Structure formats: C-alpha cells, structure tokens
Amino acid sequence: MSTVFKKTSSNGKFSIYLGKRDFVDDVDTVEPIDGVVLVDPEYLEGRKLFVRLTCAFRYGRDDLDVIGLTFRKDLYVQTKQVAPAEPTSIQGPLTALQERLLHKLGVNAYPFTLQMVANLPCSVTLQPGPEDSGKPCGVDFEVKSFCAENLEEKIPKSDSVQLVVRKVQFSALEPGPGPSAQTIRSFFLSSQPLQLQAWMDREVHYHGEAISVHVSINNYTNKVIRRIKIAVVQTTDVVLYSLDKYTKTVFVQEFTETVAANSSFSQTFAVTPLLAANCQKQGLALDGKLKHEDTNLASSTILRPGMNKELLGILVSYKVRVNLVVSYGGILGGLPASDVGVELPVILIHPKPSPGERAVATSSEDIVIEEFMQHNSQTQS
C-alpha cells in the first residue's frame, strides 16, 4: 500500500495530492515533486489552475508582519499553469503515482511536476523558545495550488491550498580514514610533554547512531588527568541577513577515568547526540518540522563546489570536542592546571533509503489517502 497526502482548500473546491513530503537532495540532483490537483469543474470555469513551489527563509515572527515589518524572504518561486495546459508547455511522462491517482480521481484531476533547482537550502527550523508563537525561524518549502484569471490577481487564503514539504539530504557512509587530531602540551616543571590524540573511524554518522571516539593519551608529565570530557557541538551560521553564529552543545559527558603521571591510556568512548536531550534549547537547529511529525537535530549542510553560501540561509555543522581536565599531583593535586583539548569534524545526516523501502502502488486500490485538515489530520481509504 502507498500513502498519499491530501489537503483540501477551505472552500472545498479543490484538493492537492502528493505521494510524499520528503524530497531527497543527493548534492547533484533533487527529486522532482510529482502530484495531482483535483478541482471542481464549475469553480475552474473561466479561470486557470496554478501550482506554485516556494522556498522561503523566515527570520522573524508572524505578528510583526502586521506592523509593516517583513521578516520573510522568498529564495525561490516556481509557478506552473496546470489547467488549461499552456500550448508551449511540455508535459513529461506521468509517474506511476500520477497514473494511479488520475485513474482513481477521474477527469477533473490534473497532474503536475515541479523540479527544485540544485542550489537551494535544505529544510531547517530554529527551535523556538517556550514563549514564542507563530511560525519558527528557518527555511521551509511549500507547495500551493490556486485558481485565478491571472497571476497578478490577489488570491484569498480560502481559495488556495498549501502543503508544506521538506528538502532533505541523505548520504552513504564514505569509505576511507576518519578525522583525527593531536595536540602536545608542555607544562612548567615537567621535562616531558602531554600528548593527546583522538580520532573516529569515519566522519559521516547517521542521526541516532552512536559516535565512537577513540582517545589515546601519553602523559609524560608530573600532572594527573582527573577527567575526560567529550562534547558534541552544533554550529549554526545564519548567513542570509547577517553574520549571526550560534553554538549549542548537543551532547556532553564527563568520564572519570584517571590517568596518573608518567603513564599512558587508551579507550574508545561512545557518544550519541539526540534531540530528546535538547528539547528546551532555544535557537537549536532542527531538520524542518512537519506539524504532525517529530523531527531531529538538523543535518549537516553539504556544500557543492562553488555554491553561494548566502543562498542557503542557514549553514549547520558539528564537531566533537575532547578535553582533558589536568591537575597537579602531590599536595597540589586538588588544584586545576588547565584543559587540554582537540576537535574533530563530524557530519550528521540521514541514511539513503534502500530502493525497495518505499512501496509503489500497482493499482488505484493500493492507495491510502491521509488527509490534512485545518487543525488536525485523519486517515481514510
């Protein structure tokens, strides 16, 4: 069975159908958005049916718009006339989903295909605070359908239907050596230095997957290492309208392993950054959220060569920090000396779905329609 997402306009005159709401950017190309619009023929008579894809960056609250301040910038807009078909338009072959939907919905259904350009950002939301209301800041994508005599006509909200979709990046695990870092620190009254080395087997990790961090310490000093602290830090660069940078710790744990003076130590630590442990952190970057679905920490931004960073709006990156808490030995053992640390880059992303992971309908009876109403959703066959 295949699930199809449906949303109907407030006036009940037309509905939009999509086979999915997540569309994959594999860095070189982006999946097309294929769907169908069902419209009341009497309502359409004398007018045109349009479908529009908008990628927008919102960096302020909705309620501020009414006082003349606009905190939204459209990064990309694509509009297609679906009915009547334009003489110069070239309709590509129907997808399997469109064929099944047209068979199920009848002659008043019209197929459409929208192709995102490759240089658009992925869907990102900045986690709002407890007092915030309205749409959160971030980058979102919206598919909208409406009827009008022309594109200059002002469209009442009740005469259109919008469905939010997401652009997401998937990645396969890259073979080859993972990131590594090393530092050497000398201390006063110690003839030999402290050496810290940390590395990972690979840079790319999937959301929810434990990250194995290997730590090797050669402590040739007269200092004692009291604790090993490992943190995962998210850095969010808002590059569209300012040079704001937000740094949030999404995982931190102190391990009580002690490394005595003039000794060595080696161990692997498992760390797992999760949104569940960071739900109250305002400004944390998340993957774009659909109202009825949970989300996760934002995926790392993967840049194409020569890409204009400003067009992406928000850039997200992660790093693992390994810090040693070093103290003096002997009678001064309780006094902290300093921290010794290194950083490792890490990419958090979704795994590529297998080819057979998504069911494909073989007939119109294999379709289950999930309908989204104004404030809730329900499933119907």
Swiss-Prot record:
Pfam short name (any one): Arrestin_N
Name of the protein in question: Arrestin-C
Protein's UniProt keywords contain Zinc: no
Tissues in which the protein is found: Inner and outer segments, and the inner plexiform regions of the retina.
GO biological process: endocytosis; signal transduction; visual perception
This protein's UniProt keywords: Cell projection, Disulfide bond, Sensory transduction, Vision
GO MF term list: opsin binding; phosphoprotein binding
Role, per record: May play a role in an as yet undefined retina-specific signal transduction. Could bind to photoactivated-phosphorylated red/green opsins.
Species of the source: Mus musculus
UniProt similarity note: Belongs to the arrestin family.
Self-association and partners: Homodimer; disulfide-linked in response to retinal illumination. Interacts with CXCR4; the interaction is dependent on the C-terminal phosphorylation of CXCR4 and modulates the calcium ion mobilization activity of CXCR4. Interacts with GPR84.
InterPro entries, A to Z: Arrestin (IPR000698), Arrestin-like_C (IPR014752), Arrestin-like_N (IPR011021), Arrestin_C-like (IPR011022), Arrestin_CS (IPR017864), Arrestin_N (IPR014753), Ig_E-set (IPR014756)
